[in-house]
């Protein structure tokens, strides 16, 4: 979903070449037919395979890294696969980008990386730490993170699932009607990445100020739009690794977050391991702030 949105944004600009790197040849073939544009170049490979990543990175100026295992339940059953793709794969991508002299890299993360309770979130939290650590030690390549909530109607999200259940006549299955989730459109997801691209410094994390919705209200809205307000809804209970609400910024991050209008920027902690000087010098930080989560943000009606 994100890849298509970015390609749509850039395909008619003066960008010389756009490279699509993924392991899914079917989706690449679909994109090739959809855009039918010589500016697009397709590369089959996997972020787990350093050689294939190295091959695609030659002569690249800018890179957006969205490859990930992102299904929470499946990562609970296969946590090492999440480690290999989300953590090791990201390090492979960053190493290739740095060695190839790429100017800017934006890495896509998730709100599930904040206070993680599941394998997917833990792997994404570690991915963010890898980005910050790399960014701390590299001057030539700017590496930053964007942290998302739910992207409306993106592949693998709940809205297409609910619509398919409605149209097939099956009950709509929800886990907890009071569960809240951040919501943003695909266009907003692209805008967040471009904002980070234009304004980021190495190790930065960027977050959009996003509204949230309860699952109950989301389902009722979809039922009304489709024209089936009385369609059955079945509560099946919380799935593996699910939270009642998601958090985009921790209390600690909110203390140092820089308000940039529609976005927050969390600069990297650039201190080194020589802690003695921090006990002997500097000012005591007394600021306190609350975390930014889907229960306390603006609610959609």
What function would you assign to each model-found segment?
Residues 65, 69-129, 133, 143:
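Conserved Rossmann-fold NAD(P)-dependent oxidoreductase catalytic core, especially the SDR/UDP-sugar
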Residues 22, 43-44, 84, 176, ...:
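Conserved residues in the N-terminal Rossmann fold of short-chain dehydrogenase/reductase
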Residues 14-27:
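Conserved glycine-rich Rossmann-like NAD(P)H-binding loop of the short-chain dehydrogenase/reductase
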Residues 24, 111, 211:
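Residues in the short beta-alpha loop(s) of Rossmann-like NAD(P)-binding domains
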Residues 1-2:
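Hydrophobic/small residue at the entry helix of a nucleotide-binding pocket
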Residues 93, 99, 128-129, 133-301:
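Strand-loop microenvironment adjacent to phosphate/nucleotide-handling motifs in alpha/beta enzyme folds
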Residues 6-11:
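Aromatic pocket-lining residues of Rossmann-like dinucleotide-binding sites
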Residues 36, 41-62:
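Conserved Rossmann-fold cofactor-binding substructure of NAD(P)-dependent oxidoreductases
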């Amino acid at each position: 979903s994100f890849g298509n949105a970015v390609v749509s944004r850039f395909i008619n600009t003066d960008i010389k070449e756009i490279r699509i790197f993924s392991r899914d040849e079917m989706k690449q073939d679909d994109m090739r037919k959809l855009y039918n544009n010589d500016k697009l170049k397709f590369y089959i490979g996997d972020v787990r395979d350093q050689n294939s990543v190295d091959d695609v990175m030659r002569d690249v100026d800018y890179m957006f890294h969205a490859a990930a295992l992102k299904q929470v339940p499946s990562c609970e059953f296969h946590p090492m696969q999440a480690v290999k793709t989300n953590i090791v794969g990201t390090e492979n991508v960053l190493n290739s980008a740095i060695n190839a002299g790429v100017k800017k890299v934006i890495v896509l993360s998730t709100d599930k990386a904040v206070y993680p309770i599941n394998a997917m979130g833990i792997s994404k939290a570690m991915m963010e730490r890898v980005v910050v650590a790399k960014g701390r030690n590299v001057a030539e390549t700017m590496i930053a993170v964007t942290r998302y909530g739910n992207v409306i109607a993106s592949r693998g999200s709940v809205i297409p699932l609910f619509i398919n259940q409605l149209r097939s006549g099956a009950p709509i299955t929800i886990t907890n009607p009071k569960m809240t989730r951040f919501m943003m459109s695909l266009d907003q997801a692209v805008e967040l990445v471009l904002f980070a691209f234009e304004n980021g410094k190495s190790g930065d994390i960027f977050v959009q100020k996003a509204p949230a919705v309860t699952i109950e209200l989301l389902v009722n809205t979809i039922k009304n739009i489709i024209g089936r307000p009385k369609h059955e809804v079945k509560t099946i209970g919380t799935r593996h690794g699910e939270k009642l609400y998601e958090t985009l910024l921790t209390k600690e991050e909110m203390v140092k977050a820089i308000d940039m209008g529609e976005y927050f920027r969390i600069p990297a902690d650039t201190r080194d391991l020589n802690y003695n000087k921090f006990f002997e010098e500097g000012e005591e930080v007394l600021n306190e702030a609350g975390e930014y989560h889907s229960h306390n943000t603006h609610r959609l009606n």
